[in-house]
C-alpha cells in the first residue's frame, strides 16, 4: 500500500490567548500540524490523530530528502490503509508543551525574550483538546468524523467526547486508560527524578547554560521503554543473551543484550527530546482523570458523550491493561452509548498500538469503513491548507 508521500508541516498561530486548566494563560501559542488526504465539500470527513508522549504531528508520510523520516503511524494511515486518505482528511497536530515546533518550554517567552524553560505553564489533556479545537476552527471544520489516539492519545480522544460532544461523531481509543494507576504514576515520578537530579538540568533553565540533561533523559527513557514492552517480547528478543561469550564480572560494563538495547534507546531519545517537555507530558498523564470531578464515577463522567466509540486493547499490555479499557467500555454501556470493543491477542505489550498487526489493522479498517459508509460525503473538496 502506498504512502501519503512527501509532506510539509504547517503552522497556526492562535488568534487569541489559550486559557489553561491550571489558571495560567498562554498568551502567544503556535501549533504545528500536518494534513493528509482531501477535505470533502461538506467538510465532514476529517479525522484527528492525537499523539502520545514522545510523538508529534508527523503521523504519516516522509520529509523531502529524509529517507528515514516516516511518520510514527505511517503503517496505519495512507491510501488503501486502515485509515484511508483516499476517503478521509487526516490531521496530526503537535500539542502545546511538546518539543516538535508547537509552543513549548524551548520557545521564547514573549515576556522575557528567553526560553520559557521551567516557567512554561503546566498543561493538561483538556488544554490540548482545547488547542486542537481552535485548530479545527481555523480549518473551518465544525465536526470530526472521528478522533483517534493510542495511549495518551486515547485519553485525548476520550476528552474530546466530553468537552466537545457535538464536534465528534466517533472516538477510537486504543491501548489507553481512564486514568493512571498508582504504579504508572510511580514510573513517571522515577523518570522525572532522573531528569531533575541531573546536574545539567539547572532547575529547567539548562538552555541558558548551553547543556542538555542527557543523563537524566537517558534513564527516563530506559524506565519508560521497559513499560512499553511485554515480558514475552523481552524474552524472545533478548532473553539472557550476553554481549560476549565470557562474563566481565563488572558492575559498570554492559553484560547483557537487554542492557545494550536500553542504553541505545536512552541515547537516541536524549538527542532529540526536551527534558522539560518530558516533565510536562508525564505530569499531564498523571493528572488525567475525567471521573475525578464526579466522585470517581466514570459512568457519570462520560454521561455527556454522544459519540460512537471503538475501544481497543492488547492482551500483553501491562501498562494500560485490557481491564482498564473494559472500565471505559462499562462506563459507556452504563450510559447506553454505542460502543465496540476489541481485545487483540498480540505479543508486543503497550507498543502494540504502533505495530503492523493484521488483526489489529483489520479491526480499524472495518471500523473506518463503517464511518465512511455512514457519514462521509462524496469526495471532491479542497486540500488541506495553512492558516
UniProtKB/Swiss-Prot annotation:
Keywords: Acyltransferase, Amino-acid biosynthesis, Cytoplasm, Methionine biosynthesis, Transferase. The keyword Transferase applies. One of its GO terms (biological process) is methionine biosynthetic process. The record marks 319 as: Important for acyl-CoA specificity. It is found in: Cytoplasm. This is Homoserine O-succinyltransferase. InterPro entries: AB_hydrolase_1, AB_hydrolase_fold, HAT_MetX-like. GO terms for cellular component: cytoplasm. Homodimer. Substrate binds at residues 221, 351. Its main location: cytoplasm. Gene3D superfamilies: 1.10.1740.110, alpha/beta hydrolase. The keyword Acyltransferase applies. Transfers a succinyl group from succinyl-CoA to L-homoserine, forming succinyl-L-homoserine. Pathway: Amino-acid biosynthesis; L-methionine biosynthesis via de novo pathway; O-succinyl-L-homoserine from L-homoserine: step 1/1. Belongs to the AB hydrolase superfamily. MetX family. It catalyses: L-homoserine + succinyl-CoA = O-succinyl-L-homoserine + CoA. The active site is at residues 151, 317, 350. Pfam families: Abhydrolase_1 (PF00561). Its EC number is 2.3.1.46. One of its GO terms (molecular function) is homoserine O-succinyltransferase activity. It comes from the Bacteria. Residues 45-354 form the AB hydrolase-1 domain.
Amino acid at each position: 500500500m502506498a504512502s501519503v508521500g512527501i509532506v510539509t508541516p504547517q503552522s497556526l498561530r492562535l488568534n487569541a490567548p489559550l486559557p489553561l486548566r491550571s489558571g495560567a494563560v498562554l498568551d502567544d501559542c503556535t501549533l504545528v500540524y500536518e494534513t493528509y488526504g482531501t477535505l470533502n465539500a461538506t467538510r465532514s470527513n476529517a479525522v484527528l490523530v492525537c499523539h502520545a508522549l514522545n510523538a508529534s504531528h508527523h503521523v504519516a508520510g516522509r520529509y523531502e530528502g529524509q529517507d528515514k523520516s516516516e511518520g510514527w503511524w505511517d503503517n496505519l494511515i495512507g491510501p488503501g490503509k486502515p485509515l484511508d486518505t483516499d476517503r478521509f482528511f487526516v490531521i496530526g497536530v503537535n500539542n502545546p508543551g511538546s518539543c516538535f515546533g508547537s509552543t513549548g518550554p524551548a520557545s521564547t517567552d514573549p515576556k522575557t525574550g528567553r526560553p520559557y524553560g521551567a516557567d512554561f505553564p503546566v498543561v493538561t489533556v483538556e488544554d490540548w483538546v482545547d488547542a486542537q479545537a481552535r485548530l479545527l476552527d481555523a480549518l473551518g471544520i465544525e465536526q470530526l468524523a472521528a478522533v483517534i489516539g493510542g495511549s495518551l492519545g486515547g485519553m485525548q480522544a476520550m476528552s474530546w467526547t466530553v468537552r466537545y460532544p457535538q464536534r465528534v461523531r466517533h472516538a477510537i481509543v486504543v491501548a489507553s486508560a481512564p486514568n493512571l494507576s498508582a504504579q504508572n504514576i510511580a514510573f513517571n515520578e522515577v523518570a522525572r527524578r532522573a531528569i531533575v537530579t541531573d546536574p545539567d538540568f539547572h532547575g529547567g533553565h539548562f538552555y541558558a547554560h548551553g547543556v542538555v540533561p542527557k543523563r537524566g533523559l537517558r534513564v527516563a527513557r530506559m524506565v519508560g521503554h521497559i513499560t512499553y514492552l511485554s515480558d514475552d517480547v523481552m524474552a524472545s528478543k533478548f532473553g539472557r543473551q550476553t554481549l560476549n561469550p565470557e562474563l566481565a564480572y563488572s558492575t559498570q560494563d554492559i553484560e547483557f543484550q537487554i542492557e545494550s538495547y536500553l542504553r541505545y534507546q536512552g541515547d537516541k531519545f536524549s538527542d532529540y527530546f526536551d527534558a522539560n517537555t518530558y516533565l510536562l507530558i508525564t505530569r499531564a498523564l498523571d493528572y488525567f482523570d475525567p471521573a475525578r470531578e464526579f466522585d470517581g464515577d466514570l459512568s457519570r463522567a462520560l454521561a455527556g458523550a454522544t459519540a460512537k466509540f471503538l475501544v481497543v486493547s492488547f492482551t500483553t499490555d501491562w501498562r494500560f491493561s485490557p481491564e482498564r479499557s473494559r472500565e471505559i467500555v462499562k462506563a459507556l454501556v452504563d450510559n447506553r452509548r454505542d460502543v465496540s470493543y476489541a481485545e487483540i491477542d498480540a505479543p508486543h505489550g503497550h507498543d502494540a498500538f504502533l505495530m503492523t498487526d493484521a488483526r489489529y489493522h483489520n479491526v480499524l479498517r472495518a471500523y473506518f469503513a463503517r464511518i465512511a459508509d455512514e457519514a462521509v460525503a462524496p469526495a471532491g473538496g479542497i486540500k488541506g491548507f495553512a492558516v
